[in-house]
């Protein structure tokens, strides 16, 4: 595609002399003898096309032919108005010039075999039927009409004036001249300033040349008796008079007409040559009006050359810098070709410039634009199916559109990937590369497909190489942007992991991903629980609400079995406890240490939270009530003991030695604790594994008040 401006090697002195530029052209011509048909990119044609007679547009011989046709197009474009105005039928000595039309007829035949690049897919089309249909629907009719011998037809039809006008169809060949200048403007080997100046001079000369022919045509189409009333018939310059101007030599007549056209375009005043009759005046009015527009065009282009602000010049500067960089680092031809093709695609599509413009728009407005452009497409991507609208809105805001040419590799197998691509237009293919260098096409990706998702989400190397089949428009989102969004929308994170597993049709793919996704789900769940518990620990109810609204489960426990309700009850945050209960948190969950939320509230002395939990069905739920109550008694925590007894713990529960809390209180001499236990119904006659009663323990302790309390309790129990 970009062979016109590509160089295999280029000196850094690009702004040198004309001689150095010619030497560059010579070296380039030699280096292209065998580079047109071979190569692995999708922009090149198969090697067997010689047999099918399809011509490559970048082939050496066709380029020579195209340059030759460019020269003949210049001749035809300039000679056509000259022939129309100065000859009413070509004289015999110029009839041989009509043979040139055979060259253009041959060019018509060549176009039936000339491969072309599809503007939508960027693939080279080499099917002769498609080539012929495209050419017939395009410029075929005008090209063929231009090849007709209109001079001979004019003479055969009795010199009908309308037939002469048909010769103007040959001006359609001027498109070859415009295409040449457009191509040279992008050729970094040629001075951009010189190219633009030559182009502008050519435009100016052609306009004045055509106007000169028009002025002369107006004079020759009047009857001979009225030719004295024309601009040239009435002309008198010094001793020369043009009364019989047809007898004046051809060169003098043309130069005189050209002088009139240039003076009129320059609008230097009403000179010695001027319009005489009404037709000439009307033509002059139209011509001067056109010259004003042309002058503005010329001045505008010269101004753009001075300020160096044109898009083409920026492209040339960037291409020059890239080629210097690639030459300095001796990059391979495949990489060079891919870089140049991609830069050319950017230039033709101008999408990078548009993206810069969008970046300057406020985020709120850009968000609405992104939703309008991409939301429908993203919602139809399998990976994001079932995700919330808020999540999708954040995704589309981070998307960037990129274009890729056929043959380009988007992702390589085994590499670390940090972006995900959504196919907006075009076609990709996933290819598995074997150890022996073989390739196996795994799948073909069309619009709404996605690549890089497995590698990015599962944090694994890219499993397959992803290659462009036809010109693609891809929507890219960076891994960092996606990760930051997923950290906020936890529920959508789980949905994406589920979609990722469902989206892999084959059993082998599913088995490969199951372990990774299971690990990610467990990791995500543990991180989410830690986030919820951390918010509960610090009393941050707003953060807690956002986490639960995003999909966090308030009943999930951390590595110690603690839930957010455990922590809130321990820390005394009544508003958080109330919120968690409203969100369905389990009020009777037990951590690995045997603590329930109610027990945590009781131990911490948060009476209001205790009442709130009991009101919603919470119980102490002690697995080893006897052992725990005995430890409370041994610690002398009488207030906690009273609360535990009030919430249903039996005073006669036993520890592993069958000792009751009253045994412990008697052994430790805690008469106040013993009184509390007796008042709560403790059995004074209970025996431990050694047959000892609380009274026996009290007597060994030698605490007279305690013994007296125990004996009174025994007497009461006996009676």
From Swiss-Prot:
Topological domain spans for side Cytoplasmic: 1-63, 115-137, 186-199, 307-719
One Gene Ontology term, aspect cellular component: monoatomic ion channel complex
Domain of life: Eukaryota
Coiled-coil portions: none
Binding site for a nucleoside 3',5'-cyclic phosphate: 383-503
ANK repeats mapped onto the chain: 523-556, 560-589, 593-622, 624-653, 657-686
GO MF entry, a single one: voltage-gated potassium channel activity
Subcellular location: Membrane
Keywords of this entry: ANK repeat, Ion channel, Ion transport, Membrane, Potassium, Potassium channel, Potassium transport, Repeat, Transmembrane, Transmembrane helix, Transport, Voltage-gated channel
Domain notes: The segment S4 is probably the voltage-sensor and is characterized by a series of positively charged amino acids. The pore-forming region H5 is enclosed by the transmembrane segments S5 and S6 in the Shaker-type (1P/6TM) and contains the GYGD signature motif which seems to be involved in potassium selectivity.
Protein's recorded name: Potassium channel KOR2
């Amino acid at each position: 595609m970009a062979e016109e401006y590509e160089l295999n090697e280029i000196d850094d002195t690009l702004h040198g002399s004309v001689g150095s530029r010619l030497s560059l052209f010579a070296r380039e011509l030699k280096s292209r003898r065998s580079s047109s048909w071979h190569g692995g990119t999708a922009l090149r044609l198969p090697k067997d096309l010689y047999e099918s007679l399809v011509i490559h547009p970048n082939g050496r011989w066709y380029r020579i032919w195209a340059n030759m046709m460019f020269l003949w197009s210049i001749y035809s474009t300039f000679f056509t108005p000259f022939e129309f105005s100065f000859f009413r039928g070509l004289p015999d000595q110029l009839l041989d010039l009509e043979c040139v039309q055979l060259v253009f007829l041959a060019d018509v035949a060549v176009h039936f075999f000339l491969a072309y690049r599809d503007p939508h897919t960027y693939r080279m089309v080499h099917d002769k039927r498609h080539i012929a249909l495209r050419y017939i629907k395009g410029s075929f009719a005008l090209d063929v009409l231009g090849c007709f011998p209109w001079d001979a037809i004019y003479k055969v039809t009795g010199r009908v004036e309308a037939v002469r006008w048909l010769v103007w169809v040959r001006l359609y060949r001027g498109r070859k001249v415009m295409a040449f200048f457009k191509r040279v403007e992008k050729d970094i080997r040629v001075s951009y300033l010189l190219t633009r100046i030559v182009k502008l001079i050519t435009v100016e000369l052609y306009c004045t040349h055509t106007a000169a022919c028009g002025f002369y045509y107006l004079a020759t189409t009047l009857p001979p008796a009225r030719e004295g009333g024309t601009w040239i018939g009435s002309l008198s310059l010094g001793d020369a008079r043009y009364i019989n101007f047809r007898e004046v030599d051809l060169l003098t007549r043309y130069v005189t007409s050209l002088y009139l056209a240039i003076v009129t375009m320059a609008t230097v005043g009403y000179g010695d040559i001027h319009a005489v009759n009404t037709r000439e005046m009307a033509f002059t009015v139209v011509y001067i009006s056109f010259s004003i527009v042309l002058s503005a065009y010329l001045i505008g282009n010269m101004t753009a050359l001075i300020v160096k602000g044109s898009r083409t010049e920026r492209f040339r500067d960037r291409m020059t810098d890239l080629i210097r960089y690639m030459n300095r680092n001796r990059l391979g031809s495949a990489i060079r070709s891919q870089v140049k093709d991609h830069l050319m695609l950017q230039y033709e599509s101008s999408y990078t410039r548009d993206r810069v413009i969008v970046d300057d728009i406020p985020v709120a407005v850009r968000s609405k634009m992104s939703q309008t452009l991409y939301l429908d497409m993203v919602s139809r991507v399998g990976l994001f199916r079932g995700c919330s609208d808020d999540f999708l809105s954040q995704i589309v805001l981070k998307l960037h559109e990129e274009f890729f040419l056929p043959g380009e590799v988007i992702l390589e197998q085994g590499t670390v990937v940090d972006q995900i691509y959504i196919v907006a237009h075009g076609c990709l293919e996933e290819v598995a590369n074997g150890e022996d260098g073989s390739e196996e096409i795994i799948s073909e990706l069309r619009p709404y497909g996605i690549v890089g998702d497995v590698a990015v989400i599962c944090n694994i190397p890219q499993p397959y190489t992803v290659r462009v089949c036809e010109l693609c428009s891809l929507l890219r989102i960076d891994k960092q942007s996606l990760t930051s969004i997923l950290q906020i929308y936890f529920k959508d994170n789980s949905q994406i992991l589920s979609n990722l597993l469902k989206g892999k049709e084959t059993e082998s793919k599913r088995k490969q991903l199951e372990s990774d996704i299971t690990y990610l789900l467990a990791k995500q769940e543990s991180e989410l629980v830690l986030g919820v518990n951390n918010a509960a620990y610090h009393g941050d109810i707003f953060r807690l609400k956002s986490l639960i609204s995003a999909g966090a489960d308030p009943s999930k426990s951390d590595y110690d079995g603690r839930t957010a309700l455990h922590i809130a009850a321990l820390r005394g945050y009544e508003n958080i406890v109330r919120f968690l209960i409203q969100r369905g948190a389990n009020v009777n969950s037990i951590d690995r240490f045997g603590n329930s939320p109610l027990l945590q509230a009781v131990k911490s002395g948060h009476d209001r939270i205790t009442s709130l939990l009991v009101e919603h069905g919470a119980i102490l739920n002690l697995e080893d009530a006897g052992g725990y109550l005995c430890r409370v008694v041994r610690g002398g925590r009488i207030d906690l003991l009273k609360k535990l007894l009030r919430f249903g713990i039996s005073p006669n529960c036993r520890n592993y030695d069958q000792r009751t809390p009253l045994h412990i209180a008697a052994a430790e001499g805690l008469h106040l604790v013993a009184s509390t236990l007796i008042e709560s119904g403790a059995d004074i006659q209970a025996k431990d594994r050694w047959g000892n009663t609380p009274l026996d323990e009290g007597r060994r302790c030698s605490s007279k008040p305690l013994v007296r309390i125990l004996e009174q309790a025994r007497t009461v129990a006996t009676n």
